[in-house]
Amino acid sequence: MNIGYTKGLTLLLLVRMLSACHSEGKEIEENAIRFESVVVEKTYPVENKKDTTTEGRVLKIHFTYPTEYANRGVLEAVQQQFVRSMLGDTYAQLPIKEAVNKYVEDYGLHLKDRDVSDFEQDTEDRTAVMDFEGEEFDTSDRPSLPEYELLSDSILFNQKDVLCYSVYREYNAGTPSPVRTYTNWVIDLKTGNRVTESEIFNEDYKDDLAKIIVDAIALYNNVDKVADLENIGFYNINEIYPNRNFYVDDIGITYTFNESDIAAGALGATSVRIPYEKVRHLMRHDSPIAHLVF
């Protein structure tokens, strides 16, 4: 097994290059939080004698996580959010490097000598009812005996006491094409808590926001009428609703719908970016991101 650690300064500079923006020639100051990365690549031998389809099963992890922040209590809370989003609730209370090592160890144990382990069956059952903000949301969902699994995260926005990142998961269980998912997280760096959809929108926002989302998808796909989306691979447009899988920046809010959520899998994930001016009337003035909106 190869495990490597990337120190924070290099990564901080990389994140700054990727996410820093300029306004009238002035660079926007980022939050004073440092990151490191742990990289894991491990091949598990197939010990089930009935399985002759592959020489081994591969797990790859590229985990970027915060290591330094002025408020120690907030830092610990944010670190737990990162572990929870990347590895699942089971590992959230462990120190990050210990959590990664434990995940890698458990992964092998659950694959060993089983067609479908109890653990995998439990997480597979939860996949059908994934709740991006629910208390029982566990991102360690995986199929039975995947041929490979990739896990990575990326920082999307890191300014004005708000930190947004996305977790990417890809796996293949012997099907013609892999499964790919993106899960977005918005963190309030004043508290270390995750920011939820219900915290930033007024009551009864969903119908109005759904229409705005569908209109944005139609505009991006250059169709004359929103109903025409169904002719190019989208499912019933009346069933497209905000799914709580979003991130924010200083321009607007972006929703991600994963493959097959609202459209045929061949279309891939759908990303919907909406400027605040389009949704400001639906948003709360007392939310953790209100200073970005108003």
Language model: regions and residue ranges:
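Hydrophobic helical h-region of N-terminal Sec-dependent signal peptides
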Residues: 9-15
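C-terminal motif of bacterial Sec signal peptides marking the signal peptidase cleavage site
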Residues: 17-20
